[in-house]
Amino acid sequence: MRQRTPFARPGLLASAALALVLGPLAASAQEQVAPPKDPAAALEDHKTRTDNRYEPSLDNLAQQDVAAPGAPEGVSALSDAQYNEANKIYFERCAGCHGVLRKGATGKALTPDLTRDLGFDYLQSFITYGSPAGMPNWGTSGELSAEQVDLMANYLLLDPAAPPEFGMKEMRESWKVHVAPEDRPTQQENDWDLENLFSVTLRDAGQIALIDGATYEIKSVLDTGYAVHISRLSASGRYLFVIGRDGKVNMIDLWMKEPTTVAEIKIGSEARSIETSKMEGWEDKYAIAGAYWPPQYVIMDGETLEPKKIQSTRGMTYDEQEYHPEPRVAAILASHYRPEFIVNVKETGKILLVDYTDLDNLKTTEISAERFLHDGGLDGSHRYFITAANARNKLVVIDTKEGKLVAIEDTGGQTPHPGRGANFVHPTFGPVWATSHMGDDSVALIGTDPEGHPDNAWKILDSFPALGGGSLFIKTHPNSQYLYVDATLNPEAEISGSVAVFDIKAMTGDGSDPEFKTLPIAEWAGITEGQPRVVQGEFNKDGTEVWFSVWNGKDQESALVVVDDKTLELKHVIKDERLVTPTGKFNVYNTMTDTY
């Protein structure tokens, strides 16, 4: 285990086209700013920035028109058109760090009481040059024109516009049941192998593709919300739930002769997460979805998506005990041990265990964890929930059987982004769960077996380098001896187009770094235009093949590449004009059973 070299690249991920991941990355809440002495000094001070980069995360709020507020004395007024342009830029590029209401998140607050003291010239310089502490150099990188920089400096001197709330009235107005439960099949009407079906996000098309895991045939393409973030399965495997970044939920009945959306609802303006009840006796009973804006979650009927209970997540931060107006809902999982949903609340640093047995008398266990909670998954026993507080480089462990915090561990890396993580049995350490990192090239292993390996439980046991920084997902399967790590957001095309593969059986645990094999996935896809990025390995049901998305621009060719897990050789390339910006892939069986 050695100290890793941070991963840094000015201007990386500035484009909203790369907004795949959930939530902000910049750790600039601790940034101390001072007005630059002169332009040359400012350029020198701000020419680079840290690996904790901003990631656009509120791209749908950017589409809402709002009226420009009045300007106070000494501040230039903006027309409605100018204000809406600035609002669009802010929500696409700034709100993920600085908050919807500009009250700060991982980035500093930008409310007028603060920005007016700094003044137009300072704001203009800071937006132009950025800072080493995480603020992107929007001007010198070319992401914003000089005119847009001036516009944004002026915009920050005005009062922020609050997006509309989204309550029961709005949800019920959006709620549609296309096929009533009594009109649906009583048994599977198609001959699809549903357990080996893949739901593939076609991000910029606002669709998903359903692909046969054996024949690689695209069985169907269905319209959904914009930029589907995840697909989740009901406990029975019958219903597929998908949620778009625009807050739209589609419920798809896979038993129908032609699987189709049987119910839909919109739960907010920005959203990322959905899950269904899995506790024995409660299978398929409820679904839950969480929103970024408004900050809330809603519990819905599992057969119709009828909204039953909306709960706001606004409240006090766990550490400073200060009120936060917009703590976003990040990952949601269903407990296998209790009739509870596990809800990550990002900015307050709280994990909520929501008991769904009595919605009229809702009981919630609130666990103080760590701020900026993002994604995570269950260990191999399904008892323990391990989640990343990415801006604080921590892993949090929750015992879902006892409903208690178990541990908080620093990963030793920068900005962990595990997806749902990877469970495997290490030759030396026993059962472990792994995460890769966005901010550096490291992979960290935490012990997960308090009974069989108590000395290793809930400790970071090893850290070793993979291909490079910018990883989004790490993956293995119980039937595989390999661990796959992508580097999707790395600026180097050769790295972002490849994956690292580690032989688990060859891991020694003696402090030496395990070797890895590089698979040139993008090269295998035969795509020559753009800079296709390889993202998220997903296994088939049996763990004999692993699929990767080769993600390119909306108007460029993309593909899916299938790798033979035994030989690590190319097995198949899926290309089709309907595969527009494929990103996340979700095998029905693995998703239904939390196999990862």
Curated annotation (Swiss-Prot):
Q: Which cofactor does it need?
A: heme c; heme
Q: Which compartments is it annotated to reside in?
A: Periplasm
- Where is this protein primarily located? periplasm
Catalysis performed (reactions)? nitric oxide + Fe(III)-[cytochrome c] + H2O = Fe(II)-[cytochrome c] + nitrite + 2 H(+); A + NH4(+) + H2O = hydroxylamine + AH2 + H(+)
Cofactor details (free text): Binds 1 heme c group covalently per subunit. Binds 1 heme d1 group per subunit.
Signal peptide from the UniProt entry: 1-29
Q: How does it assemble?
A: Homodimer.
Q: What is this protein called?
A: Nitrite reductase
